[in-house]
UniProtKB/Swiss-Prot annotation:
Residues 14-42 are annotated as: Involved in cell cycle arrest. Induction: Expressed in the middle to upper layers of host infected epithelium. The modification Phosphothreonine is found at T57. It comes from Human papillomavirus type 16. One of its GO terms (biological process) is symbiont-mediated arrest of host cell cycle during G2/M transition. The gene is E4. It comes from the Viruses. Phosphorylated by host ERK. The phosphorylation triggers a structural change that enhances keratin binding and protein stability. InterPro entries: Papilloma_E4. This is Protein E4.
Length: 92
């Protein structure tokens, strides 16, 4: 007991200090995240300088290519020389 006045005013407190086991306080747990974290990769100037620019004219001549934009998605449909149909959907 650090305060002698408390010991004379409350004599039973000294019994508490001698027999009561002292345990360290438990740390407060961190709350669980309410949603998973999404890690975004920020583009830097170095990344942009390494990506090739889109050519003004297509690399291959193709008259059968169709594309549509639906909300924020791009849908591409192309046909190969062998008659195979290729459908690509790009989402942001």
């Amino acid at each position: 007991m650090a305060d002698p006045a408390a010991a004379t005013k409350y004599p039973l407190l000294k019994l508490l200090g001698s027999t009561w086991p002292t345990t360290p306080p438990r740390p407060i747990p961190k709350p669980s995240p309410w949603a998973p974290k999404k890690h975004r990769r920020l583009s830097s100037d170095q990344d942009q300088s390494q990506t090739p620019e889109t050519p003004a004219t297509p690399l291959s001549c193709c008259t059968e290519t169709q594309w549509t934009v639906l909300q924020s998605s791009l849908h591409l449909t192309a046909h190969t020389k062998d008659g195979l149909t290729v459908i690509v959907t790009l989402h942001p």
